[in-house]
């Protein structure tokens, strides 16, 4: 935003200046202060000159320029708006005013001021970014075509690539500029940020180290380093990296304090989320997403949905989170519509060119096929990144279900038993699938023990039904009979008696065939006697007769 200057900001020296020089005193020149990026000093000089009546041409613009570069956008806005009201104002004020509106998030005002400005490279870059903000693809492409192969335009293009999640394209531009401009150290931070977004956290650290060697107290760089540590190690390691920033209470960037508070919530696993995140929802883009994640972890699916339902997703992370929330709500409400929306979001991300070969992209395709119950396809994707999630309970939970659903109950059982989370191990989906694996793997006693550990509830009743029916199908009649017996006691449904009768007769047949111990007959008779059905006596009479003939004690 440096204003073009045809002459020095300070005019010819007055006699008073000569006198001061003779006394050995020297007032700094505006040009020198600007070249040293001493914007505070420059503002002080300009305000002093304004106060003593030595105001130079375009003083408002220069104070606005300095305030802008100090991050004091409100002060810059005040100066530029005053300058714009002047008769025959410098036309360059409009593009600078537009940039200030942009940084204040006042995009409509920025566009209006931008169109009043004379055509320039800066105006085109500004309108290019505004088109992105307004999701106006047609205007975006028009302004894109006006970009030239100069550093400022290419950096602007790289920024748009980054915001559109085209991280590799942004990296290519930054690296090309760095080849000829090694002194542009900050570009290393941008490259590191792109690698972070691509999940290459170790590469991001290496690139970031180049910048931190020169500027070790950079707020943005230290924060990114902490985020890399969070991904590579854990929250404690990340928090340790932020300590120097937290100790630096004199940081001039107010936004940094908010950023640190936000990231500490993430690093601490959601601790303090309800106190810190809500006020930041419209300040830090990730705050809304992390608050949604917090609600999901607290099983408050409805609150998560309320927070994200009106968000128009533009990044893969937003699409993924909307998919997860809709899937959770669909399961909770039994809503096919929400499940379909979730499946479409997952497919959109997983099928995109930028995400199809990333782990999140493959996770999305696995989730899409999971919702479609196409478990062979689920396994293709899960197997492609299995090595990264060996000890991850959520991954193992889904992987085991997919294995069991495709008939590989042996491996499904093994993976289910790797899960450590007590919350997952008490989930009915876990219990029912593990019970099914046990039954299919000829371990019905273990399935029965899962039921015995449960408290009486609707879920324990459902597990009984599963054990009764699956054991019957597998010819494991003893545990089928026990399950049907309990079901019959809880609910005198004729179907349960029929199941119990069939299972008891099945056990008797297995005893006759020598595939079940004869002593089991005593318990079968006990199960039958607990039923008041008229058919019981006939069945018992036949069994007793056989027992007597074969000298089996009953």
Curated annotation (Swiss-Prot):
- InterPro entries xref list: TPR-like_helical_dom_sf, TTC26
Record keywords, A-Z: Cell projection, Cilium, Protein transport, Repeat, TPR repeat, Transport
Which residues fall in a compositionally biased region of kind Basic residues?
18-27
Gene that encodes the chain:
Ift56
Cellular component (GO) terms are:
centrosome; ciliary basal body; ciliary base; cilium; intraciliary transport particle B; neuron projection
Annotated organism of origin = Rattus norvegicus
Task: Give one Pfam family, short name only.
Answer: ANAPC3
PROSITE patterns, per the entry: TPR_REGION
Q: Which Gene3D superfamilies match?
A: Tetratricopeptide repeat domain (1.25.40.10)
Under which name does UniProt file this protein?
Intraflagellar transport protein 56
- Any one biological process term the GO annotation gives: protein localization to cilium
Q: Where are the TPR repeats?
A: 57-90, 92-125, 151-184, 468-501
Per UniProt, subunit arrangement is: Component of the IFT complex B. Interacts with IFT46; the interaction is direct.
Q: Give the protein's function.
A: Component of the intraflagellar transport (IFT) complex B required for transport of proteins in the motile cilium. Required for transport of specific ciliary cargo proteins related to motility, while it is neither required for IFT complex B assembly or motion nor for cilium assembly. Required for efficient coupling between the accumulation of GLI2 and GLI3 at the ciliary tips and their dissociation from the negative regulator SUFU. Plays a key role in maintaining the integrity of the IFT complex B and the proper ciliary localization of the IFT complex B components.
List the lineage, top down.
Answer: Eukaryota, Metazoa, Chordata, Craniata, Vertebrata
